[in-house]
Regions:
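Extended helical scaffolds that flank P-loop GTPase cores
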Residues: 95-209
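Long, contiguous hydrophobic alpha-helical segments, chiefly transmembrane helices and signal peptides
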Residues: 5, 22, 74-77, 132-136, ...
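P-loop NTPase switch/communication element
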Residues: 1
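Conserved C-terminal guanine-recognition region of P-loop GTPase G domains, centered on the G4
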Residues: 5-75
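Canonical P-loop GTPase G-domain recognition
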Residues: 52-105
């Protein structure tokens, strides 16, 4: 599948830049993916697409505020404004040299486990926090892909920590907690970012009623 191919490429550590395209009318849902990609690489530019359609629905996102909160460039693209696409392409040609992207913060027990794992990981093109997170998730297929970046010591420590965490997060509770943290972070980022006003069509319908 395309999603798995994209994940494999990102996890190879070879991506110099990543462009993530989001639907302006579904920003909060799309932001979960943005945050997950930021865990793999800080070299992300966000493109908010279909701005015209969002505005017709009465939604106006504050892209400057969104960029400040995410810690990476955010550009809007509108079909009516050809300059918006040109600005995005120029930004991709001249990316910022330093970025401090927003992190997803997990429940305290999981954060403590990440802190224990990170120092045990060898240097690699991928962030230690991301690798530690994947060790805690324990997905066999992904760990196989990442095996070149994982020392035997880190793999053993990850297995031991997963077993210890099973007491506080039995069954699927650990993966559910990780997913929930991403959703909550996206909700916090989006707070106040989108201004909602009645769309023109909705106003007309109200007048007719």
């Amino acid at each position: 599948p395309e999603e798995q191919a994209a994940r494999s490429f990102l996890c190879s550590g070879k991506a110099q830049q990543v462009l993530v395209v989001c639907d302006a009318a579904s920003l909060e849902r799309n932001l979960v993916l943005v945050l997950q990609i930021l865990e793999i690489t800080p070299n992300v530019t966000v493109c908010v697409n279909l701005l015209d359609e969002a505005r017709r629905k009465g939604l106006t996102p504050d892209l400057t505020l969104l960029s400040q909160r995410l810690g990476v460039p955010v550009y809007g693209v509108s079909a009516r404004d050809k300059r918006s696409a040109a600005a995005l392409l120029e930004a991709l040609d001249n990316p910022p040299t330093a970025r401090v992207p927003l992190q997803i913060f997990y429940p305290p027990a999981l954060e403590a486990a990440l802190e224990q794992l990170e120092p045990r990981l060898p240097p690699s093109p991928l962030p230690r926090r991301f690798l530690a997170l994947k060790l805690l998730e324990g997905e066999p297929s992904l760990l196989k892909e990442l095996s070149a970046y994982l020392s035997p010591e880190a793999v053993a420590a990850g297995s031991a920590l997963r077993a210890a965490l099973d007491r506080d997060f039995p069954g699927s509770a650990r993966t559910d907690a990780l997913a929930s943290a991403a959703v909550k972070t996206a909700e916090a980022v989006m707070r106040g970012v989108v201004t909602r006003v009645p769309a023109k069509g909705a106003e007309r319908d109200l007048r007719i009623d």
